[in-house]
Amino acid sequence: MAVVWMQQNFQQLIEQLKGTLGKLGARKLIALGLVGAALMGAILYTSIYLGRPSYETLYVGLSRDDVNRMGLALGEAGIPFDVKSDGSSILVPIGKAENARMYLAEKGLPTSNNAGYELFDNMGSLGLTSFMQEITRVRALEGEIARTIQAIRGVKAARVHIVLAEKGSFRRGDQKPSASVVIRAEGGFSAESAQSIRQLVAAAVPSLDASSVTVLDTNGHLLASAGEGANGAALMTASLEQQVASHVDDSIRKALAPYLGLGHFQTSVQAALDTDRRQTKETTYDPESRVERSVRVVRESGDSRNNRNDNATGVEQNIPQEQIQNRNGESSTEKTDRREELTNYEVNSMTVSTVSDGYSIKRLSIAVVIDQARLLQTAGTTPPPANFVDQQITKIRDLVATAAGLNTNRGDVINVTAVNFLDSAGADMEPVSAPWTDTLLRQSGSYANALAILAAVGLLIWFGLRPLLRDQNVKPAGTEVAIREAGEVATPNFIGGAESVGEGVQAVIGGPAAYADQMKTSLSDLRQRMRMPAKLRLEQMIEMDEERVAAVLKQWIHETASGREADPAKASAMPELKAA
């Protein structure tokens, strides 16, 4: 039923629209179409052209000297320009950027104080000493290195000073080159970038060691200095620890976010790393895989006898030339036999040399703070079960330990606490709002578009919808006046004068050809028109022929001013005509 009702209403709406458009006539339809086309064109124009900024960027990231020189050049060329509040960007009117760039390129702008090898372009070979050529070469090298450093993210400007080694005939030791770099850094600059700058300068200058390069910023902060080998390693270790802690913290947040939701927990991770370099050499032997390589057998045998005759001590030994008989003596016999066997084996061996130049995690310290109110909401019941918070904290601790890769054997520590978060946290850290004038200037294009669209809609309503609504609005029957019989109603003479109000009504009915044809073809149409309010009929009279109505009004006013007796019908029609 609802669908049928909607279809009927839609059909009625279409019929009413067709009827309304049919009553307007060709002239009004053409005028309405022209007004609509003009409004659409105005809306399209405002959306395309008014939304475009009046100025476009010519160059960004310029130094103050370049901005001043480019401003003078553009002023001489008669090109309007503007400079942003940061003082490093130049704007020109839309459509003049190409001409401005060509003109500035002809003038050699923008330029920089860091001149490179183009110094040799305008240098003549005559009249130059070796000292001047060497100075120019050093200047060119400094300028080229400074340009390369400025290409690093976070470096706004750079200046390089290089001291090359001077050769001397009466010097015992060679002088080593050195360099210093001064940079103007932005927010994205880090300590690792300072070390990178040192390596860059050392690689660009012959025989220059990275430890002889000093890097500092325009605020006077020393970023890297000569002889800080240990400090450089410490900085790298600290940076590496921050990266590891950040990676572990991200892993914990990814694990807790689906469970608790963002903003209901806070994590903190501290990592201690071991970055010592180790070299290990290990040799392993396999006794089961021995192979007999050589066998050596040595055999020795011996047989020895020893006889010893000793005379007995007595008087006979003191008698000269007396043969003494050996009565006592010792004899011994020795026989030896020795065998020696030596077998050599080949045993498989494996030697492993390990050089560890990376890092290992010595200890992790993790702290997790959870919003207790949010934790109680996950219970689903009020009040929550007993020991619910402790059980949830245990689960979260296990989850965090798994996500972070905790190892209790190396002394890792984890602490999970549930507390009530403050609702006003961060209330005192509200961002400072920009001045309303800046906001108004930035949104001026949008405001112009909005005003143009509102004006177009207002014109469409005034010239398009208002006439339609005026034709549709008919006063109630209480405002209608009785129309006399057609034979008794006189018609006004629009050319020569006016007889009565009845004459005017008959002129409205029979004047235009369209109304006359309709009267002849349909009596019901005539009755319907006769029932129309007098004001509406008079408005139609004015729309059909304004000149005749104006002539009638002039004649009536002239008659009234001359003091002639006015016709009662004319007198009753005067307020209606004035209102129309």
Curated annotation (Swiss-Prot):
Q: Name one GO molecular function term.
A: cytoskeletal motor activity
Task: One Pfam family, please name it.
Answer: YscJ_FliF_C
Give the record's GO CC terms.
bacterial-type flagellum basal body, MS ring; plasma membrane
Q: Where is the composition biased (Polar residues)?
A: 309-331
For the keyword Cell membrane, the answer is: yes
Disulphide-bonded residues = none
> TM spans, by residue?
29-49, 445-465
> Where is it localised?
Cell inner membrane; Bacterial flagellum basal body
Q: Give residue spans, biased composition: Basic and acidic residues.
A: 274-308
Q: What happens when the gene is disrupted?
A: A fliF mutant is attenuated in a murine model of infection. As the infection progresses, the number of cfu per spleen from mice infected with the mutant is significantly lower than the number from mice infected with the wild-type.
Q: Where is this region: Disordered?
A: 273-339
Topology within the bilayer: Multi-pass membrane protein
Entries under Gene3D superfamilies matching the protein:
3.30.300.30
Keywords for this protein: Bacterial flagellum, Cell inner membrane, Cell membrane, Membrane, Transmembrane, Transmembrane helix
| Free-text function comment from the UniProt entry | The M ring may be actively involved in energy transduction. The flagellum is required to cause a persistent disease in a murine model of infection.
The entry describes its oligomerization and partners as:
The basal body constitutes a major portion of the flagellar organelle and consists of five rings (E,L,P,S, and M) mounted on a central rod. The M ring is integral to the inner membrane of the cell and may be connected to the flagellar rod via the S ring. The S (supramembrane ring) lies just distal to the M ring. The L and P rings lie in the outer membrane and the periplasmic space, respectively.
Could you identify this protein by its name? Flagellar M-ring protein
Q: What is the source species?
A: Brucella melitensis biotype 1 (strain ATCC 23456 / CCUG 17765 / NCTC 10094 / 16M)
Query: What is the gene called?
Result: fliF
